Structures are given as structure tokens and as C-alpha cells.
UniProtKB/Swiss-Prot annotation:
It comes from Oenococcus oeni (strain ATCC BAA-331 / PSU-1). Residues 133-327, 671-861 form the ATP-grasp domain. ATP 1 binds at residues 129, 169, 175-176, 208, 210, 215, 241-243, 284, 298. The gene is carB. Belongs to the CarB family. This is Carbamoyl phosphate synthase large chain. Mg(2+) 3 binds at residues 820, 832. Pathway: Amino-acid biosynthesis; L-arginine biosynthesis; carbamoyl phosphate from bicarbonate: step 1/1; Pyrimidine metabolism; UMP biosynthesis via de novo pathway; (S)-dihydroorotate from bicarbonate: step 1/3. Mn(2+) 4 binds at residues 832, 834. Mn(2+) 2 binds at residues 298, 300. PANTHER family: CARBAMOYL-PHOSPHATE SYNTHASE [AMMONIA], MITOCHONDRIAL (PTHR11405:SF53), CARBAMOYLTRANSFERASE FAMILY MEMBER (PTHR11405). Gene3D superfamilies: 3.40.50.20, ATP-grasp fold, B domain (3.30.470.20), Carbamoyl-phosphate synthetase, large subunit oligomerisation domain (1.10.1030.10), Methylglyoxal synthase-like domain (3.40.50.1380). Residues 402-546 are annotated as: Oligomerization domain.
């Protein structure tokens, strides 16, 4: 079937900011799909609100809009661009919901815009719980007994009929948002009410729980000719009851008999054909481990995180194929880009095992509920490939970057056998390590299976790893055991620990015994056909399929899994680095472990190694490829932390030298740099013991900003105001030592600003100065930013530029550097320098239209900025205003406090662009999910220290016509200052209080400033939690409130009586 000739222009909707449930996989799929459509000759218009993506680069689509993903803005773009068709299946749940809204609005029909790929009817049949159930019943495909509830009363009634336990599943939500397994009616009341509020169609499914069944997934493709195939089969290590994104997942399936596999495969193919989906779909099924009974759990009629995993696990580019199917091509017409010879209709065949392990944010949020269930909590994931399950699992464990290299890196000696068994259910993020520890103690596979419902096949594989552990400890320096361990994924660092050697010594021993990994190709055809993919994984076998070319190469170290503090912006930088290396004539090699990202698309680089980002795994690739240099500037703290050990092993690092990286990262060395350059810096010292920290604090003076050295995303950073707080922090948050001192700084209040600069050692260019909206004390990664600067005076800007230039020269910067300042009493103080690409790089690159990562790479490869037409200095600002706003995922982590401070908490970002600040702010707030009401009720609950500042803001709300509500202390203060205010009671009281007011929909905005000594169980914390739970815009920084007021004021008209006041 030839591709469609009746359409010329296609609008592609992206997925917006990174949140828990919707991460970098949609940048990968959106980029793939857009390029695929352009490859076929179509004009592509792309809209997304997230600047930290490759898909919003101007070369990805013919027209790129960075605008809020809301109905009004999409409609404006549709009217302006007049596309012939709309593709909404590669932008996650956000794009699907928008497609539904656009169709219901009538604009698609009005402008004669066709929905490509999966039609609205199919989307509704898969997403609407009632229609899905009806379709499954018509197909005679079993679904768990369930009822649709549209009210709380219906939910309770249906649950009583079905019987507990039940699963509550809200319709049209993302990542299982609002979903939960419920044991009783009291729990149901809370969960169902929340689910109905979260569902855009006010609908929840009350479903009989089948927790404990095996969870199986199929990624399925279908074209317009009804050709369909299974791209990948995936099995969850964890049984039904844990969201698949929070499960360890294995591909291909491991424990099914041929009969079971064919039965489920047939069901999946029957469903995609019945839905008439054209493109890709993810189908989740539950199989009774003791019979052939199975149930259909759900169908995702779009590209998903599982699709990205399946694409990387098999090499089959699902989003690319889905885009081609959407414009009319059929699977038997599309060439498989992996082989270059076979067609896309052939099902991939795997001669290896891929394992995915989720990356959770619990290292950042100690107070978070670690229990795993039907609502996802992972921010990202890693994938590893091996010849067997054991190898892939061990490689995935060390890819997580949580300090674990093997199964014995987390043990539970403080727990008895029974206590540890009991901890298996409900499951937490540590269950895998708990299982290993139980097996180590001699607890049987049967006992663990009975408690956890994890299949005995997987438990037996873990036991095999425990047995190898024991053998290694018993047979020190035994080469035979070493070989077995390496064939099963054990890293050098773990074996060296067992044998009481340094890692370097074990590496030398391996080399002496000629024990090296070889690299096998991921080819989709299990070696049956020749393949041209440059996509490899390591294994300890004989034949190496990755052959070194004569052309000189450069290795780029990726950034690993998405987590808070290190997001998709670093993958953006990695991809741009690769492009520049290729343009310079070198072979670009990428090593990374993240299946969601564009950098791990095999078509991006000349060679891709899907490997953990550890010293051993990176050195193994370097030994084979012998690159002319290695780039660590774009992989965030992950790559920077490898720099020293790589150089110590004789690796040449491109860009800023290791010595100068360390001078910027090590506090004492950096203090000497600041002193030498005569720059201003908050007074501070380091401490290596608790006693020393208390002594330093007295010298520096409270309040203090405390943080460990060498951290990412402000982890374990805190503002303390007294000796007791400091003592508690030192005991709770950090492991202080001579090697890892704690930094203790005077906390200066003031506006923050930052600079990203580019230097070749001679010419230094500054694209722009970014000014933060929130003052010092809120982590820079959580602070809204504005470019160009709006409020910094010329003198302050010159101070910043002078300091940045001096630092770049003194640190011999080759490439990128990020410098952060606090402006205190018109003096610019240097607070931090990052000798690498920072998380602001995509934002400033998009705002200035300057490919900074590519330019930095060219500089690292020896080019001079002067030869490229640049002169030292600050570049002329753009005429538009650009605002970066942050997005948080507190609704997925209900026990995490939503107040902002020096510890980073955001998961993603959006950008607002317009001709003036107020309009750009409006777009940024809307894109970040804030509801902008022209009037309503605003709650003030303010700590004493902030009341005076809050008063001015309250007056502005009053002028706009907002009704002021407040808690007792704040209410008295506002009343004393002659403002009308309604007082609310304490949460413990029966009268109307902030929490019940929010639940009743009576509050449109909540402004909460916490006290410095606020206890965990406080009204303030409960108010913040209720705002998140009820979707009420919450502000914990008065600076953000002022910016929001600027938006409200710009959108309202002033009304005043002409006879008001004295005119004389």
C-alpha cells in the first residue's frame, strides 16, 4: 500500500515535561517519529513544552513550537499551521488526552484535520474502562470482574458486591496515577475519591484484585492491511500488583511454556486487530501461575515506556515504524533498518536476555513511602543485556548508580529471618536485595516464593548468583571460578573485595590470564541474517563482533538513568556532542545504560555500547576501541565522577583537565582559587567530623547552608538555623569523613543568577545571564529562570561576567562551565562552579539559538572560537523573553514534603516564550500545570518571619478581587493591617479548615511558608499535602507568588471609581 499522497503536513504532539510516569522515552519516540515522517517527504510541525529535548531542536521538524500543551494553545497552532493530519500516539498520555479534547472541541472536524495512526474510537475503546471491558467481553477475552464507578457511593457499592481486595484504576490517567490495591471500605473511600478527582472523565474502575499472577507484556505492531506482529515479549519479575514501570522486567519471557506463550500471543494479536490500531500498542496480561487461566489487564494504544524498552531490547525501532504505518505504509513494505535487507514484518528474534531495573528517587527522599504498588514511583530505569539472566541482572544492578555493584551490597543483618521474610510483602525497592539475603541465609526458594509470589525460576537464578558468591569467597585467586563469575556478570570491584585486592590489581590479573569481554551485536534476527547495526553488549565468550575501524574515534560517556538532579538535559547534551564529533570527521562512540533516551538509539552514533557506566565497563570499551579521547563533560556527575579514575588508567580526557575539574569540585582547592582571584564568596569552611562542624558553625555564624562535597542535585543539602538542627543533620544526612568533608557556608539571602559559558582557553563567550525568580535557598534546579535578565542592574551583571571570565581562565576551561551567583546587597558572590554541561544547557541553547554542546565539542577537538567567528564577551540578548519553570511529581510521592529548599525535588521543566515577561511567565505557569484563575479564594498560611513581605502580596490579591482566607495567626496579622480575611480553623478542629476547604473545592491558590523548626506532623505539612492531593496550585516561595501575581495582573483590567479619593 503506497504512502498517503493526500496529506502534506502533519502536526506531532510531544509529551511535555519529565514527570514520574512520563520520562525521556517520549523524547526518543518523538524524535524517531518526526525524522521518520520527514524521511518520507512530509512537512512536520512539532509542539512540545519541554526545552530539554532533542525533539524540540529545529532540525527535527520543519516548524517547532515550544508552547504549553493545552487545548487553547494547540488550537492556535492548528489554526496557524493548518496541518492535514495529527499524530498523537508518540506523546504519551498527554498527547492522547489532547487528541481526545481536540476531537470533542470540534476543531479537527472544522479544519478537516485527520487523526493519524490509532483512531479516536480505538483510543476510547482502550482508555475508557467501560468501553474496554465491553470490547473484551465481545471478543470473549477474560478481564478481572469489575465495575465502572462515577461516584464514591457507586465505588463502595460495587466493591461490596465484588469483594475485597480490589484494585482502583482511574480512567485516562498516567502511570497508574491514583490507582491502588484496597483492602477495606475505609481505605476505598479515600482512594476512590482521589481517583475520581484525578480522572479527567471522573471515572474509576473497581476491579477484583489478581495480585500474585504473572504479569506478561507484549509490544505489538499492526498496519492498515491488518498485518500484525509481536515485537517483544516481556515478563515482569514482580507479579501483578506492582506497576510494570516499577517492576524488574525481562525480555524475552522466561517462564512460559510454549502453550502458554502462544495462548497469550494469540490474545494480544486478536486485541490489536479488534481495536483496529495502526501502529504500536502495549498489551498487559495476567497469567495464573497454576493454570491456563489468564486476564487482560490493560491496553496502551500508544508508544509507552515499555515501547522504548522493547525497542532497545530488540533493536526494532517501534516509534519509527509506527510513524511510517500512520502515513499508510505496510509492514511488508518497510525495510528493517537494523538489517537493511529484511522487512519490518519479521518478528525480532533474541539470542540474549535484556533486564530492566527501575531507578527510584528514594535516595533523594528519605521520607518517601518506599512501598511499591499500582501507582508508579520510578523516575527512570536502566537496561542491561547478557547471554543469560544472571549476567543481565548483575549488569543492571551496577548500572543503577546507587552504590550497588552486586547482590550483597545491601544486606539486612539487623533483621531476623522472619522479619526479613515479612518485609517481602508489601514490596519495596529493596526487595531484590532482600531475596538475595534470604537465600544467602539458607531460606528456601519455596518459602520465598510463597511470601513474594516471585516465580521460582527467577529465585533459582538468584540462588545461582549467591552460590557463585560463596565459591569466590572460598577459592581466592582461582582462575576457573573467576571465569565463571565473569560469565555471570560479576564485576571486578566485587570480586576484588572478596579477594581483598584493589580493583586495579584484579583487572591486571584478568589481563594476565587473557580474560576479556567480547562484544555481540543486537541485530533483531539472532544472527540469522547479516546486520549493519552498530549496537553492542559485552559477554565473556570467544568471538568478538565489534571490530575496530581505522578511522579515529571519540568516546562519549552518557549520563545513565533519569533521576532527580540528572535528567534528560544531559542526554540532550550527549546527542549534540555526538553530532559535532561526526561533523568533525571522527567516529562517535556512545556508552550508556538508559533505554529511554535518544543517545541509546543506535542510529544516532557510529557505535553504541549498551553497558553500565562503571570504571570497568568503560575501560573495557576503551581497551577495544582505543579512542583518541574521552568526553565526560556531557554526562552530568556520573561522567565527572569517572574522570579521575579514567585518567589514572591512562585515558586521555578531552576538554578541561582533571586537575582543574578537581580544583572546581574540591572545596579547599576552590577556596584558594577564589582567594587568588580576589572574588566574593559566602564565608564558609569545611568539616570532617561532627565536632569540627559544630565549631565551624560558631565561627561562620547562623543561618548556615550545609552540604556534602561532590554531590548532584543538592542531595543532602539543608539550611540550618541553630546548633541542634546542625547536630541532627550531621547524624542523619551525611557520612562525614576526611575523604568526604561537609561544606558549611554562611547563608546569604538574595536573588540568584547563573551563567553558562564556553571557552577555548583564549576566547570566552557568554550566551546570556539567567536570573532566578526564587531567591537563594531554593535549589537552582528547582528555581524558575528568566533570560535575558530583567532586574539585575548593569553593575551586578558586570561583576558576574568579570568573575566568570577570571574563573574560566584560572581553571583553564576548555569547553563548558556553569557559574552560579547569589546577589546580596548589590554584590555578586560566587556560590558554585560546575566544570561541565549543566542542566540549564538546553534552555539557554534554545533561548539563544546557539548549539552550545556542539560548539563545546568542536573546541575540545581543537577548533578555536575566533576561527568560528566568535569574540569574547556577553552575546547580545534576544528580543523575546524566555522563562524556565519546573515541574514536580509530588502526587506520585505523597509522603514527600513539597516545600522547596536547597535539596532538589523537580523532575522536569517547561519553557514559556513571549514578547514580554508577564506573557512568558503565563505560558510557563500554564505549561507546568498551574491553573490560572482570574478570581477565587487564596489561602495564606505564613510563618512570622515572612508576614511583612506576604502583606504586600495579599494586598495585590485583594486588588484583583480574590477573597483572602488565612489560618489563625496570619488572619490576625492581615486583619490588623485592614485587609478583609476569612479565618480557617486548625486541622484538628471540627470547623472549616484548610484541608476540608480544599477537598470541597473552595480554594484556588494556597500560599504556605513553613516555619524553620516545623515538625513532621504539622498543620503546614498537612496543608501542603492536601494541596498536592487536590490539585490546588501551591506556592512555598513568596518570590514565585510575586511572579504569579504579575501574570494575574497582566491579564486583568483595572477598575476604579472616578470619584475615589481626593483629586485635588
Amino acid at each position: 500500500m503506497p504512502k498517503r499522497a493526500d496529506i502534506k503536513k502533519i502536526l506531532v504532539i510531544g509529551s511535555g515535561p519529565i514527570i514520574i510516569g512520563q520520562a525521556a522515552e517520549f523524547d526518543y519516540s518523538g524524535t524517531q517519529a518526526s525524522l521518520s515522517l520527514r524521511e518520507e517527504g512530509y512537512s512536520v510541525v512539532l509542539v512540545n513544552s519541554n526545552p530539554a529535548t532533542i525533539m524540540t531542536d529545529t532540525e527535527i521538524a520543519d516548524q517547532v513550537y515550544i508552547e504549553p500543551l493545552t487545548l487553547p494553545f494547540i488550537k492556535r497552532i492548528l489554526r496557524k499551521e493548518r496541518p492535514d493530519a495529527l499524530l498523537a500516539t508518540i506523546g504519551g498520555q498527554t498527547a492522547l488526552n489532547l487528541a481526545k479534547e481536540l476531537a470533542e472541541d470540534g476543531i479537527l472536524e472544522e479544519l478537516k484535520i485527520e487523526l493519524l495512526g490509532t483512531k479516536l474510537k480505538a483510543i476510547e475503546a482502550a482508555e475508557d474502562r467501560e468501553k474496554f471491558k465491553q470490547l473484551m467481553e465481545a471478543l470473549k477475552e477474560p478481564v478481572p470482574e469489575s465495575r465502572i464507578a462515577r461516584t464514591l457511593e457507586q465505588a463502595v457499592h460495587f466493591a461490596d458486591q465484588i469483594g475485597y481486595p480490589i484494585i482502583v484504576r482511574p480512567a485516562y490517567t498516567l502511570g497508574g496515577t491514583g490507582g491502588e490495591i484496597v483492602e477495606n471500605s475505609e481505605q476505598l473511600t479515600e482512594v476512590a475519591k482521589n481517583g475520581l478527582e484525578l480522572s479527567p472523565v471522573t471515572q474509576v474502575l473497581i476491579e477484583k484484585s489478581i495480585a500474585g499472577y504473572k504479569e506478561i507484556e507484549f509490544e505489538v505492531m499492526r498496519d492498515g492491511n491488518d498485518n500484525a506482529l509481536i515485537v517483544a515479549s516481556m515478563e515482569n519479575f514482580d507479579p501483578v500488583g506492582i506497576h510494570t514501570v516499577d517492576s524488574i522486567v525481562v525480555s524475552p519471557v522466561q517462564t512460559l511454556s510454549d502453550r502458554e506463550y502462544q495462548m497469550l500471543r494469540d490474545a494480544a494479536l486478536k486485541i490489536i486487530r479488534a481495536l483496529k490500531i495502526e501502529g504500536g500498542v502495549n498489551i498487559q496480561l495476567a497469567l495464573d501461575p497454576d493454570s491456563l487461566r489468564y486476564y487482560i489487564i490493560e491496553v496502551n494504544p500508544r508508544v509507552s515506556r515499555s515501547s522504548a524498552l522493547a525497542s532497545k531490547a530488540t533493536g526494532y525501532p517501534i516509534a519509527k515504524m509506527a510513524a511510517k504505518i500512520a502515513i499508510g505504509l505496510t509492514l511488508d513494505e518497510i525495510v528493517n533498518p537494523v538489517t537493511g535487507t529484511t522487512k519490518a514484518e519479521f518478528e525480532p528474534a533474541l539470542d540474549y536476555v535484556a533486564v530492566k531495573i527501575p531507578r527510584w528517587p528514594f535516595d533523594k527522599f528519605a521520607e518517601a513511602d518506599r512501598e511499591l504498588g499500582t501507582q508508579m514511583k520510578a523516575t527512570g530505569e536502566v537496561m542491561a543485556i547478557g547471554r543469560n539472566f544472571e549476567t543481565a541482572l548483575m549488569k543492571a544492578i551496577r548500572s543503577l548508580e546507587i552504590g550497588t555493584f552486586a547482590l550483597d551490597d545491601l544486606t539486612y543483618s539487623d533483621l531476623s529471618n522472619q522479619d526479613l521474610l515479612n518485609r517481602l510483602m508489601p514490596a519495596t525497592d529493596e526487595r531484590l536485595f532482600m531475596v538475595a539475603d534470604l537465600l544467602r541465609r539458607g531460606i528456601t526458594i519455596g518459602q520465598i516464593h510463597e511470601k513474594s509470589q516471585i516465580d521460582e525460576f527467577f529465585l533459582d537464578k538468584i540462588l545461582h548468583l549467591i552460590e557463585i558468591e560463596k565459591e569466590l569467597k572460598m577459592h581466592v585467586l582461582d582462575f576457573k571460578i573467576l571465569k565463571i563469575a565473569k560469565e555471570n556478570g560479576f564485576p571486578d570491584v566485587t570480586i576484588a573485595r572478596y579477594w581483598q585486592l584493589e580493583e586495579k590489581e584484579l583487572r591486571h590479573l584478568r589481563k594476565k590470564e587473557d580474560l576479556f569481554p567480547v562484544y555481540k551485536m543486537v541485530d533483531t534476527v539472532a544472527g540469522e541474517f547479516s546486520s549493519k547495526t552498530p549496537y553492542y553488549y559485552s559477554t565473556y565468550e570467544l568471538e568478538n563482533e565489534s571490530l575496530k575501524e581505522k578511522r579515529p574515534s571519540v568516546l562519549v560517556v552518557g549520563s545513565g538513568p533519569i533521576r532527580i538532579g540528572q535528567g534528560v538535559e544531559f542526554d540532550y547534551a550527549t546527542v549534540h556532542c555526538v553530532k559535532a564529533i561526526q561533523k568533525a570527521g571522527y567516529k562517535a562512540i556512545v556508552i550508556n545504560s538508559n533505554p529511554e533516551t535518544v543517545s541509546t538509539d543506535f542510529s544516532v552514533s557510529d557505535k553504541l555500547y549498551f553497558e553500565p557506566l562503571t570504571l570497568e565497563d568503560v575501560l573495557n570499551v576503551i581497551d577495544l576501541e582505543k579512542p583518541i579521547g574521552v568526553v565526560v563533560q556531557f554526562g552530568g556527575q556520573t561522567a565527572i565522577n569517572l574522570a579521575g579514575r579514567l585518567e589514572n588508567n591512562g585515558v586521555k580526557l578531552l576538554g578541561t583537565s582533571l586537575k582543574d575539574i578537581n580544583r572546581s569540585e574540591d572545596r579547599e582547592d576552590f577556596n584558594q582559587v577564589i582567594k587568588k582571584l580576589d572574588l566574593s564568596q559566602p564565608f564558609g569552611k569545611t568539616a570532617t567530623t561532627v565536632t569540627q562542624a559544630l565549631s565551624v558553625a560558631e565561627e561562620v555564624g547562623y543561618p548556615l547552608l550545609i552540604r556534602p562535597s561532590y554531590v548532584l542535585g543538592g542531595r543532602a543539602m539543608e539550611i540550618v538555623t541553630n546548633r541542634q538542627d546542625l547536630s541532627d543533620y550531621m547524624k542523619r544526612a551525611v557520612k562525614v569523613s576526611l575523604k568526604h568533608p561537609v561544606l558549611i557556608d554562611s547563608y546569604l539571602t538574595g536573588r540568584e543568577a547563573e551563567i553558562d559559558l564556553l571557552s577555548d582557553g583564549q576566547t570566552i563567550i557568554v550566551p546570556g545571564i539567567m536570573e532566578h525568580i526564587e531567591r537563594a535557598g531554593v535549589h537552582s534546579g528547582d528555581s524558575m529562570s528568566v533570560y535575558p535578565s530583567q532586574y539585575l542592574d548593569q553593575n551586578v551583571q558586570e561583576q558576574m561576567l568579570d568573575a566568570a571570565f577570571k574563573l574560566a581562565k584560572e581553571l583553564h576551561t576548555i569547553g563548558l562551565m556553569n557559574v552560579q551567583f547569589v546577589i546580596h546587597e548589590q554584590q555578586a558572590y560566587v556560590i558554585e562552579v560546575n566544570p561541565r554541561a549543566s542542566r540549564t544547557l538546553p534552555f539557554i541553547s534554545k533561548a539563544t539559538d546557539l548549539p552550545l554542546a556542539q560548539l563545546a565539542t568542536r573546541v575540545m577537538l581543537g577548533e578555536k572560537l575566533a576561527d568560528l567567528g566568535f569574540k569574547s564577551g556577553l552575546m547580545a540578548p534576544k528580543k523575546l523573553v524566555y522563562v524556565k519553570a519546573l515541574v514536580f511529581s509530588f502526587n506520585k510521592l505523597p509522603k514527600v514534603d513539597s516545600s522547596l529548599g536547597p535539596e532538589m525535588k523537580s523532575t522536569g521543566e517547561v519553557m514559556g516564550v513571549d514578547r514580554n515577561l508577564a506573557k512568558a511567565l503565563y505560558k510557563a505557569f500554564v505549561a507546568a500545570g498551574f491553573k490560572v484563575h482570574e478570581h477565587g479564594n487564596v489561602l495564606f498560611t505564613i510563618a512570622d518571619r515572612d508576614k511583612k513581605e506576604a502583606l504586600a502580596l495579599a494586598k495585590r490579591f485583594d486588588e484583583l478581587g480574590y477573597v483572602l482566607w488565612a489560618t489563625a495567626g496570619t488572619s490576625s496579622f492581615l486583619h490588623e493591617n485592614h485587609l478583609p480575611v476569612r479565618q480557617l480553623g486548625k486541622i484538628s478542629e471540627d470547623q472549616l479548615n484548610p484541608v476540608t476547604a480544599m477537598r470541597q473545592g473552595k480554594l484556588q491558590i494556597v500560599i504556605n511558608r513553613l516555619k524553620t523548626d516545623e515538625p513532621l506532623e504539622s498543620d503546614g505539612r498537612a496543608i501542603r499535602a492536601a494541596a498536592i492531593e487536590n490539585g490546588v496550585p501551591l506556592f512555598t516561595s513568596l518570590d514565585t507568588v510575586a511572579a504569579f501575581l504579575q501574570v494575574l495582573e497582566s491579564r486583568s483590567f483595572n477598575v476604579s471609581a472616578i470619584n475615589k479619593g481626593d483629586k485635588s
